[in-house]
């Protein structure tokens, strides 16, 4: 912990510079129209949006067209073994990937035009985007979201007495419930782009049952 705090302190001046440059690139990014309804998913080095970092962000529209998909090289983390065991993204895989700030303007252009954001535990994804200075607190709170995980939890019906609510289920469970074929897109499960397609599929299935 002491080592981590020392590293963060040493990086702070550079992080502030990166943040200023990121804000400037947002202003200068060419204007382009993006869909108002999007599906988003992320992969990260851990669960803390203000200490961990993004490894991949993927965004598709409601018709399944890919709007954004990129891996990222973390600025602070050199390894993330626990997260890697789940998302299968190794340090070697992202060694030559861009840093998040290099894609910040493009990401922001898509998010700033979105009126409706669909995701599986979408709050997790948006908090990481906020923690990476892609969106502000105000923008985060203003987004209209559709959390497929919450919707599916009630459909699946596994009730938690402790939480007095329906238990959240993994995306793989939701996909299996609706017989989703992960191979249809030829992308490995837990890749954030694959998760976007699976989330959209489950979302459409839920809508068709209403």
Task: Label each residue range with its predicted role.
Residues 191-202:
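Acidic, divalent-metal-coordinating active-site segment for phosphoryl/phosphodiester hydrolysis
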Residues 204-210:
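Short, hydrophobic alpha-helical segments
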Residues 10-137, 142, 165-180, 184, ...:
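Conserved non-catalytic scaffold segment of RNase H-like nuclease domains
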Residues 158-159, 181-184, 209:
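Substrate-binding/catalytic groove segments of enzymes
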Residues 146-166:
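Short alpha-helix plus adjacent loop in nuclease-associated cores
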């Amino acid at each position: 912990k002491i080592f981590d705090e020392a590293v963060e302190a040493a990086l702070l001046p550079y992080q502030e510079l990166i943040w200023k440059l990121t804000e400037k690139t947002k202003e200068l990014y060419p204007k382009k129209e993006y869909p108002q309804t999007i599906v988003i998913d992320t992969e990260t080095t851990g669960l803390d949006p203000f200490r961990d970092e993004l490894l991949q962000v993927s965004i598709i529209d409601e018709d399944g067209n890919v709007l954004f998909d990129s891996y990222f090289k973390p600025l602070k983390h050199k390894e993330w073994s626990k997260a890697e065991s789940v998302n299968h993204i190794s340090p070697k895989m992202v060694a030559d990937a861009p840093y998040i700030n290099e894609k910040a303007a493009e990401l922001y252009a898509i998010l700033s035009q979105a009126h409706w954001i669909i995701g599986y535990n979408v709050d997790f994804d948006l908090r990481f985007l906020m923690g990476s200075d892609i969106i502000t607190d105000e923008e985060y709170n203003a987004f209209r979201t559709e959390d497929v995980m919450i919707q599916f939890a009630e459909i699946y019906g596994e009730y938690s007495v402790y939480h007095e609510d329906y238990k959240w289920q993994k995306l793989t469970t939701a996909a299996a419930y609706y017989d989703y074929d992960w191979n249809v897109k030829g992308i490995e499960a837990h890749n954030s782009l694959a998760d976007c397609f699976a989330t959209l599929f489950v979302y459409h299935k839920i809508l068709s049952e209403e």
